[in-house]
Amino acid sequence: MSQVELPLIDYAAITPILVILGAACLGVLVEAFLPRHQRWSAQVGLSLLALVAAGVALALHARQGGTGVTTLSDSLAIDAPTLFLWGTLLALGLGAILLIADRSVESGGAFVAESNDTGPAGAGEMTRATAAVAGMRTEVFPLALFALGGMMVFCAANDLLTMFIALEVLSLPLYLMCGLAKRRRLLSQEAAVKYFLLGAFASAFFLYGLALLYGYAGSVKLSAIAAATAGTDRSDTLLFAGLGLLVVGLLFKASVGPFHTWTPDVYQGAPTAVTGFMAACTKVAAFGGILRVLQVAFEASSWEWRGVLYAVAIVSMAIGVVLGLTQSDIKRMIAYSSVAHAGFLLVGSIALTERGLAGTMFYLLAYGFTTIAIFGVISLVRTSDGEATHLSDWAGLAKRSPVVAWVFTFLLLALAGIPMTSGFVGKFVVFEAALADGMAPLVVVALVASAVAAFFYLRVIVLMHFSEPAEDGPTVSVPGAFTTAAITLGVVVTLLLGVLPSLALDWANLGGFVS
């Protein structure tokens, strides 16, 4: 009788994942056994401690030169891009947890305490008094850690089956988190249902593509698929169909147009802190998976699929900037901005060079911190119903709160790609890599899209600084320590990466993928 061979596990290499997922499991126990009044402090402390501990473990492993390692029967690849993306996710996760934890802006926190706590006539709203007594729904913290752990596995997945499992681990908590908003409950729950239904549909595409590629290559490992595509004795039908379905699932998660239809509604309906978490961290994980799949498994057949993704990038940029111009809700505007930025990121992803890889990863880092800070600022501008997201509410904001208005102005200019911000450097390195790889027409389209996108950022800036505030306009809440820390972190990193980009670019250039 043959014995089952146990997989070799490099525990040092996967310690950051184990810390995050272990803390998520402890968070579930906290919810089960601690009294309600003790849960918030325990969950916040546990989450922040886990993120810092995972970051320290990652730094120690990177310092010891622990790159180019495959573990768990080659299902995970711990290489230089993995370490960069893990570091990015942990840093962005820290900023998002700070936003989620803040209870000073919204009495009792931004998350509903009980699913059946509603306001008068079943309006789906909680009163401030009810919210303050009930407290904050603290299971959002382990849900965020589970999602973050899934994102880390997704970035490192070296076979399609591991990638699919990680996709579900990161997606399911996000579906729940989207429906936990205290204010505008029905809108939040509608967003959660839409995200779940469309996400399940996209996961089915990914899984079907996985099955076809397994039939094509006889394996789900990326290296085996790469070896199969290098040959000429197999059916191209399975390859093209499998790759197409697989990429649809990946592009959906990255909010790339035309697979972006969930993005505006979910960004608008989800709690603002959760929107920031999704907008920053999910995009990092999704493009981490896209980069690995394209560069490891399908580089040999790139001439067959690059034209399709070339067109998809153009469509995504066009949808993002054109529909972004028409929006009157600031969260929906940022959602369409995200679709446009996904197109810019796709430009670097299909370059298939080390410069394209490094540029795309730098862009993800820069965009993530700017986005976290933007949603932190949005959470401060409030009416009696919650955040003031209609653009008219932001008129004259500089006269009511000049500091908040100028911070938001700086962040919008970073998204527009103005020099001395991280957004400018991110676009520059991505477009330079695309030019070097012979994609000049695509870069021209991207530059035009960037110019058009700058218009709707400038529209908000002009509205804040050169319009008169309404007498019954929204108030600007005094941010608590957590929100202040998250916004400050985002602003400082956005400025530093614009002035000293080598701080991150040198790390991003340390090496490519291993398989």
From Swiss-Prot:
Catalysed reactions, semicolon-separated: a quinone + NADH + 5 H(+)(in) = a quinol + NAD(+) + 4 H(+)(out)
Name of the coding gene: nuoN
Location of the protein in the cell: Cell membrane
GO biological process: ATP synthesis coupled electron transport
Protein name as annotated: NADH-quinone oxidoreductase subunit N
Organism, scientific name: Saccharopolyspora erythraea (strain ATCC 11635 / DSM 40517 / JCM 4748 / NBRC 13426 / NCIMB 8594 / NRRL 2338)
Pfam families, per the entry: Proton_antipo_M (PF00361)
UniProt subunit comment: NDH-1 is composed of 14 different subunits. Subunits NuoA, H, J, K, L, M, N constitute the membrane sector of the complex.
Chief localisation class: membrane
Top EC class for this record: translocase
NCBIfam families reported in the protein's UniProt record: NDH_I_N, PRK05777.1-4
